[in-house]
A protein has these predicted regions:
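Short, small/acidic-rich helices and loops at N termini and domain boundaries
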Residues: 1-24, 28
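N-terminal pre-Walker A segment at the start of P-loop NTPase domains
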Residues: 30-44
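Pre-Walker A adenine-sensing motif
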Residues: 42-52
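Conserved P-loop
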Residues: 54-132
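Short beta-strand segments at enzyme active-site cores
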Residues: 90, 143-148, 184-193
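Catalytic P-loop NTPase motifs of RecA-like helicase/translocase cores
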Residues: 96, 152-153, 197
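Phosphate-binding/switch loop-helix module in NTP-utilizing enzymes
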Residues: 120-183
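Phosphate-binding/switch region of NTP-binding enzymes
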Residues: 168, 175, 179-255
Length: 255
C-alpha cells in the first residue's frame, strides 16, 4: 500500500511575512479554541498533561535517540486527523512510511491524505518551511509538527564559534511558530536533541534558554527498559513539574 502524503517541494525562499494582530472579538473566538486539548491516544501521557496536548502553544519533547520522540509525533498526527483536522509535518529526520502504517493502522492511506509534509534539507529550508505554515494554517489545521527542530541546527553550530547567531535563528523559527499557534489555535509539537552537560551533569536540550522560554510545555523522555519509557514534565504552566508517567512503545504506537 502506497501512502499519498501531501508533500511540498516548492523552492525555499525566505518570505517577509507580517503578523496580523487580532481584534478583541477574534481573540475571544481564538481563546475558545485554545482551551481544547489534543489527545495523543496514549492514556498515561494524556493524563500527565492534564488531558492532552494544549493548543495554541509550542510543546517541546526532548530526549536521547530512541526514546520515542518521533513515535509521539506520528501518533499525535494520526489522532489529530482522526478528529477531523489536517496536520502539517515538517520532517528533518526522514519519516518512516512503515512506522506510519503501523501506527495509523488499516486507514493509513486515508489518514495520509490529510497530512501535509515538508522535507527541508538545510537549516535555511527549515526556516522557510516554518514560514510556509502561515499560508495554510487557516485551512482546518489542528497540529503542526517539527521533527526535529535541532538536527540542522547542530550543523550550523559547527560554523558558528559563539553559537549566538544560530540560537537566535532557531529562536526566531520557533517563536514564529508559537505566534501562529496562538493566532490559529493549533497545537505545535517540536522535538529536540540533547547534549551532555559536563558542568551540571546529565543531558540537557539544545537551543539554549530562548527555546526553553518559547516552549510552554516541555517533556523529557527517558529509557527505562526494553520498549518502556518515562515521560517527565520538565516545564508546564498548570501541572506539577517533575511529575512523570510510564508508557510503552508497541508495534501499534505508544500505549
Amino acid at each position: 500500500m502506497e501512502l499519498s502524503f501531501q508533500k511540498k517541494t516548492k523552492n525555499y525562499k525566505k518570505n517577509i511575512i507580517s503578523l496580523v494582530f487580532h481584534t478583541s472579538l477574534k481573540c475571544k473566538k481564538r481563546c475558545h479554541v485554545i482551551e481544547k486539548l489534543l489527545s495523543s491516544g496514549c492514556k498515561p501521557l494524556d493524563e500527565l498533561l492534564g488531558g492532552g496536548f494544549e493548543r495554541g502553544i509550542v510543546t517541546q519533547v526532548f530526549g536521547a535517540a530512541g526514546t520515542g520522540k518521533t513515535n509521539i509525533c506520528i501518533q499525535l498526527a494520526v489522532e489529530c486527523v482522526k478528529q477531523g483536522q489536517k496536520v502539517i509535518f515538517i520532517d528533518t529526520e526522514g519519516l518512516s512510511p512503515v512506522r506510519f502504517k503501523q501506527i495509523a493502522g488499516e486507514n493509513a492511506k486515508e489518514i495520509a491524505r490529510s497530512i501535509i509534509i515538508y522535507e527541508p534539507l538545510s537549516f535555511e529550508e527549515q526556516y522557510s518551511s516554518v514560514r510556509e505554515v502561515e499560508r495554510i494554517a487557516g485551512e482546518n489545521v489542528g497540529l503542526v509538527v517539527l521533527d526535529s527542530a535541532t538536527s540542522y541546527y547542530r550543523y550550523e553550530l559547527e560554523d558558528d564559534e559563539t553559537g549566538i547567531k544560530s540560537r537566535r535563528e532557531l529562536a526566531n523559527q520557533i517563536g514564529f511558530l508559537h505566534a501562529l499557534a496562538r493566532k490559529h489555535g493549533f497545537a505545535a509539537l517540536i522535538t529536540n536533541q540533547v547534549y551532555s552537560d559536563v558542568v551540571g551533569g546529565g543531558v540537557r536540550p539544545l537551543g539554549g534558554s530562548s527555546l526553553e522560554h518559547i516552549s510552554k510545555t516541555i517533556i523529557r523522555l527517558e529509557k527505562t527498559g526494553e520498549g518502556t519509557r518515562r515521560a517527565v514534565l520538565y516545564k508546564h504552566r498548570s501541572r506539577p513539574e517533575g511529575s512523570s508517567a510510564e508508557f510503552t512503545i508497541t508495534a501499534e504506537g505508544i500505549r
